[in-house]
Amino acid sequence: MWTSINQALNIIDNFVWGVPLMVLIIAGGLLLTIRLGLLQIRKLPLALKWMLQNEEGGKGEISSFSALCTALSATIGTGNIVGVATAVCAGGPGALFWMVVAAFLGMATKYSEGLLAVKYRTVAEDGHSLGGPFYYIELGMGKNFKWLAKIFAFFGVCVGLFGIGTFSQVNGISSAVHGFFDPNDAFTVKILPFLGEYSWSVVIASLILSFCVAAVLIGGVKRIASVSQIIVPFMAVIYFVFAVILICCNITKVPAAFATIVTAAFSPKAIPGGAVGSMLIAMQKGVARGIFSNEAGLGSAPIAAAAAQTNSPVRQGLVSMTGTFIDTIIICTLTGLSIVLTGAWQVEGLEGVQVTTYAFQHGLPFPAQFSSFILMLCLVFFAFTTILGWDYYSERCLEYLSGGNMKHVKIFRWIYILAVFIGPYMTVSAVWTIADIFNGLMAIPNMIALFALSGVIVKETRAFFQHAKEEALAEHRSFEEVCEENLNEEEAPAN
């Protein structure tokens, strides 16, 4: 049954992630990069500084750092560990190159999303902030494009329920737990007649995870933000440290690994032994998994950015931009390099988390069981916070679709928890293909909006920095000092 389903899903995936969508995403990032004057390079130090600072007196529900952590909680997940592995195995090492290229351009895209989210956000009757692509499409492009905003919101709900939010994350967690506690299926349980038998570790993991998710979701965005603010930085540092140790232990292989990655990115045979492996496949998998991981262009992060306590669209845009830098250019690159260095991507019979597990077991100077445990721990917490972040995104999308009917949102929350329980019982390939399909469909209306509103983005950016530059020259103060002072004086535009 799963074979037929996978074949059908692959056909749909190849259609959605064809050349037009890749051109749309890459061209959009390139256009914004050029029009903003390589802002992701010039303003990255300032963005990283502001990332750790809270703005006093800003409008919104949570701090900019909490908003970033909420966004990072949704982006740093199985995509960084499992997604990179599936991309390299399916598209060859060259997929990692295209993933980084897409992420570099995606930093300009993510900046633009964050800026528009704050500029066009509104406030609900109960006082919580509302923002995201559906609002900057409707308010920025005009009421005539409300249908496009609704399409985005619909696919946003689908991505949360069937894609990044639940199935892929829970599947990744259960695979890691299964591989660590019961790799030989010593004890199995039959849940439903048509599902077959599954390891007890998978069943217990799905039950515990569903309960934990339910416990946090009841608290809303503030509880999600508080949990994410603790877990995300801590686990990201742990994963970073162990990945760097792995690379240092194999430092002599690094030049050859980089050469392989770059060569394979432009090679007609990026996959060993297969004429199917081509530059197009490497690009397709790299861009698709990159979008899965950092969500630049997807339109999800601006939903969290709209809740940030800030009066400056530019400030939040810069803070949002750092998410893509941390998620893909740092964490995904470390994962991909680890996989290429250890040759894990060439081992037959491995898929998904098994590939990264092999890399950690054979690349780290620790016992294999300990290395597996560290990876499992990182994956569990990364995926858990992603599930939380995507529930928030999906609820805001549904709130927009239902005209603010919170009864629908509360019902959806329990459906979401049910989807968390179901996720482990699907095949890895089906889960990731479904995620890719809905990601692509969600990205299309958002990228159209970014193209249409690129003039607004450039105007807001130039006005902010030009004013700060002139004031700094007139008062003989530093540019950064003036920028920070202007943040506390600037008011969000009225809608």
Regions found by a protein language model. Give the residues of each.
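Flexible loop linkers connecting adjacent transmembrane helices
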Residues: 38-64, 86-88, 92-96, 108-144, ...
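Helix-loop-helix module between adjacent transmembrane segments
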Residues: 28-33, 73, 102-127, 134, ...
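Extracellular loop-to-transmembrane helix junctions
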Residues: 10-46, 89-128, 148, 327-334, ...
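Alpha-helical membrane segments and immediately flanking helix-loop junctions
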Residues: 57-90, 116-140, 151-154, 158, ...
